Amino acid sequence: MKVPVLPLRNLTTSPAFYMFVAFAAGVLLGDSFYGQLKSYVDWAVVLVGLLVVLAVAVLYFYDRRSSLPLVSFAGVACFVLGTVVLVDDRKGQEVIWAEGIKTYRVMVEDAPVEKENVWQFTGRVLPTEDISDGSVRNDIGKLVRCSVAKKNAGGAKRALVNDEGDGQVGKELLLRPGDELLMRCRITELHNTGNPGEFDYAKWLRRQGVSGMAFCYAGYWMNTGESDDMPLTVKALRARSYMVERSAKYLSDDDLAVFSAITLGDKTKVDKEIRNVYSSSGVSHVLALSGLHLGILFGLWQIVLKHLDHRRRRFFLFMRLLGLLGLLAFAYLAGFPKSLVRAALMLAFCQMQHHFQGEPFSVNNLFSAGLVILLFSPQALFDVGFQLSFASVLGILLYMGLLITPKTLMKRPVLRWVVSLALVSVVAQLATFPLVAYYFHTVPLYGVVSNFVAVPVAYLLLMLGLVFYVVPFLQPLMAPVLHFLLSLMNTFLGWMAEVPGGVLHFRPSLVAVLLIYVVLAMSFRALRRGVKYVDWRFVRCAVFAFTLCVGVELYAVWRSNLNPQIIFYGSYGGVPVHFIQSSSSSYLWMPSGVGAMGAEKQVEHLKDGFWADHHVAPPVVVADTLRRDDCLVRGNVAWFGGKTVARVNARLRSGEGRMPLAVDYLLIERGSKSPLSVLLEYYSPRQVVLSASLSDYYRRRYAEESRRQHLQVYDMQAEGALRVEL
């Protein structure tokens, strides 16, 4: 019996697009309503199976001249499947962590990042019996975001101990992927500080597959060496770390940071200054392994294939597959980042199409690669790199066909390469600037110029990097050449980042981003047949969407003005208290002993978030005393907008308080160890605010004592920042 062929006559040339959109819509639904849907996963699986059976039945028994029933069943099946895969992935991350401090055996899963006082990494919990009570954990295999202190504040070592008091001093060694750590700490659920407008770090970690977070003090963790349970991906990252360490003998810190990022995808040594330079100059994609890097490597392999005998199809196919295996090995060594996986899959689809006389570079291949990625990692849909990678490639595939290259350039390879690079840069920047503005709030305007230097230099660095890593005895000879190229690129990009007007600061809302993409889509439809045959219907739609976008942004600016209010910002150190009169006039009250520099460090994350969204001018930083018409601060008490706030961050003695001062809010911070009854000898509050800097013991104790005194309690650890409208 002849197997029926999938009827695609009435579909567009990209059937994978519809499947991808349906699957992505299901992923969005599953993420938005996870709590309500997680109990119905089994029924959803049955529904997917039923839809597949119906689709197969349509292929055999329905009129094959009509594709609507098949497309409908396939679309609904992909939609439900996307929901099922996302919900199942989220359920696999759920865990109830043990209460209190326990001993964990953790394997370093990714490349650790060394900060000034801590190591930060993602670790996987390994099977172990608790040293204290012999209980077996049920959280085996879960990922935890760990921060381990390198030393105590006073520089003294403390012992990794169990309940019997035995222990060993923790070793501060260079951490690598695959190292096994014994940690005595408490693992908590993912949470944020709860400040308004802050980056949702907990959600970002969850979408990376992380289930908990932990902080381990110095001396309470110990590096026991290489783990015996390393998977292949961790072994690859460990090998990469050794390669980077060997390169450090011949390259400076800045050169090593950029070189290892471009060639191996190791960005752990790239500091904030380098990131800002590359971002402001519009070439941050050079530091992130993506289709650019795989395209360079595969282009080199294509040069080799051109000299082979194409008539020997089997041998030629074998060489193509060998090249693809090389790309997969490169992606494996880099840790399989989403952008690199997308590029590798797309190149694989392209080579298959090309071998069978199909169109190699098509939108269908792009969405086929995306569908495969989401099928195995549904939360990759929310990854910024994944979105930017797809947007840039989709823009290039769609818009490059509209740009006609003059025939005179076809005879001049160098000039043709320059024009092609400029066009690709313009199209990629046009396709990604809404997402870049939404996530990073900046749009580099001179990215096209920067790419003329960054892309060729990255090409040379990647080629030389292959020789540098494969032939170690040439490293001393190649180091000066690499230093020259890296210095050339870094100097030029640093100059481009400082050019006046080179960066546009733009903070669009999600609605505005969607409308901008509507404008781009309508423009593409209008110019689809060329400049001479403009479809003015779509031009009018684009103008309407652009006008609506401007209106949405103007309304957002009008809504951003702040009314008088007091905000207690969440912080694990001293709590910054923000007295806001208006967006242009405010005061930031810091705890005693923390001056302007300390305030700058603690509230740095607020500048690019809540303050920028509401156009808040730099506040007046208050440490001890302030006397203004609208604000008065004296010691540990402040008056603003008819409200009185007192803060306690030191031990108070009983019997020394006179008449209690009536206050609206009593802020209790780390350092306060006196019972609440003693604090009430000094202050008579309407509400007690507990800082997140308090330990669990003191937070529970103060909360219980406040309830016994019939006082309102606000726990910043559980509820985040406290915002009081005046």
Regions found by a protein language model. Name each.
Residues 10-61, 383, 390, 476-528:
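Membrane-embedded alpha-helical segments of integral membrane proteins
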Residues 2-9, 65-69, 77-285, 614-633, ...:
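Membrane-interface helix/helix-cap signal primarily in integral membrane proteins
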